[in-house]
Amino acid sequence: MKSIRIKGQNGDFSIADVGFGYSQILPVITKLWHTSYIINLYNSNNNFYSRLRFRELDKSIILMEQPELHLHPAMQAKVADAFIKTVDATRESETPSTLIIETHSQAIINRIGRRIREGKVSPDDVNVLLFQKDEKLQITMIKQIKFSNEGQLRNWPYGFFDPED
């Protein structure tokens, strides 16, 4: 019987013993790793026939819904770094990855902003779409919000992360 173990500063632990967040994020991290691995394998193989096997990798689009669920905010920030590393690992390839992430995580948004401020991510590579219900019209409006070069969200609605009283 096989088991998944998590290595930490205080030793190794079974995934069943470290909290629900690890088991929830494992498929996300596995998909990110697999995408980077397959694309790098594809790009490093100069054999024409071997490359034919991978031609469906013309563009890799990964969709994720609330990857932050059950994760500590510090771990959410690390997951954001994993998103950035996946895109970076495939950026120069013939098959770059695009990630579409639905999140309510301030930690993920803030980490992406920090990486932009540090120059590790271009603000042009990030799109934030905000879905807001218009109570008067009873429809949901979609607003595109961009990061500045300093990693700040432009025109972010007041009270989104800190609700008004």
Describe each region flagged by the PLM:
Residues M1-P157, F161-D162:
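Switch/communication elements of ASCE P-loop NTPase nucleotide-binding domains
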